[in-house]
Each structure stands twice: as C-alpha cells, then as structure tokens.
C-alpha cells in the first residue's frame, strides 16, 4: 500500500518552513509521496485578500521541483465553490493508498470546528506539527481527547522550531525588507515580477 502525505495551505507565499515540514514528514513517516495542495476557495479565508490560485500554484511548483517525492495537485484550485478538507481526502482515498494529512497544531486544537471533522479523521492519519501559540501540555491534552473520542491515533511530528510565516513574509515585502532567507529565490523572482504583497 502506498503512503501519501497531503499538506494543504494557501501558500501565499510558500516558504522554507513548508518545505522543511514536508521533508521531515516524508522522512519520519516513510511516505512514498508528499502532495502539496494549494487551497482554492477556503471557507476560513472568506473575505480576505488572497493571491490568485494560478500564481500560488506556480510558486509551489517552482519550490518543489528539485525535491524527490514532492508533487503538487490542482484539485482544490480547480474545484468550484469552497474547498473542504474532507472532500479532498475522499478524492485521493482508495484501497491502494494510506493518507496522512499534515497540518499545524492550530488545526488539532480546532479540528471539531472543521466541516465533517469525523470524516477527516476516518479518511486519514492526522499528522500534527507544533506551531507557536500552544504549549506542549495543551497539545497533548487535545491529542488524547481526540484520540479517545474518535478512536484514532494522531501522530506528532518531531521538528526543529522554525519561526517563519507567510503573513510575516508579506509584511516584510510591504516594508521593503529582505526575505531571501525565508523564501526560495525562484519565488522571490515570481513575487517581484508580479508585484505581489506591496500593499496588504
């Protein structure tokens, strides 16, 4: 059976933190493939300014081209209407594939607020990486609560802490600060060519 990891996000822009998480998940969980899933029309971002799906797709594609086992899917950006995680997992799930949904600690804390969270937990193995804002104690408590309630096993990734966020990168670009230590060079070129994030 193939083992596929799915890492979703707006990737606005993608940065080294995303690539590091994907690389470590692939290595630690012996995954055959990591599928990057740029969000199309995420319900939790409604009303917020988001870079076009086409450009976000190009940024991800340029970032992952030199990584073995990294791929990208257009499923969510080509889907009409809102993009719900459980629908994405249903699309990729089959008898020959075991899915690993890779997400941040904030998702674990709010998982029961997600659309059809029970389906997310039944269709995939939830793989969680730590993010600022939550203590280990809070994370473990929520992990044990969800595992007991839904009869699932949640995987916590062991990662070195990288404090990089797309929000911070956009703010730095707006303030004409350097971001080349956060973002791959081809992405900086795409950002500059398309005049992105000058006004947030």
Swiss-Prot record:
Entry protein name: Probable nicotinate-nucleotide adenylyltransferase
Gene from which the chain derives: nadD
Transmembrane segments: none
One term of GO molecular function: ATP binding
Family the UniProt entry places it in: Belongs to the NadD family.
Enzyme Commission number(s) from the entry: 2.7.7.18
Listed InterPro entries: Cyt_trans-like, NadD/NMNAT, Rossmann-like_a/b/a_fold
Keywords, alphabetical: ATP-binding, NAD, Nucleotide-binding, Nucleotidyltransferase, Pyridine nucleotide biosynthesis, Transferase
Metabolic or biological pathway, per its Swiss-Prot or TrEMBL entry: Cofactor biosynthesis; NAD(+) biosynthesis; deamido-NAD(+) from nicotinate D-ribonucleotide: step 1/1
Originating species: Clostridium botulinum (strain Alaska E43 / Type E3)
Function noted in UniProt: Catalyzes the reversible adenylation of nicotinate mononucleotide (NaMN) to nicotinic acid adenine dinucleotide (NaAD).
Catalytic activity: nicotinate beta-D-ribonucleotide + ATP + H(+) = deamido-NAD(+) + diphosphate
An individual GO BP term: NAD biosynthetic process
Name of one Pfam family that matches: CTP_transf_like
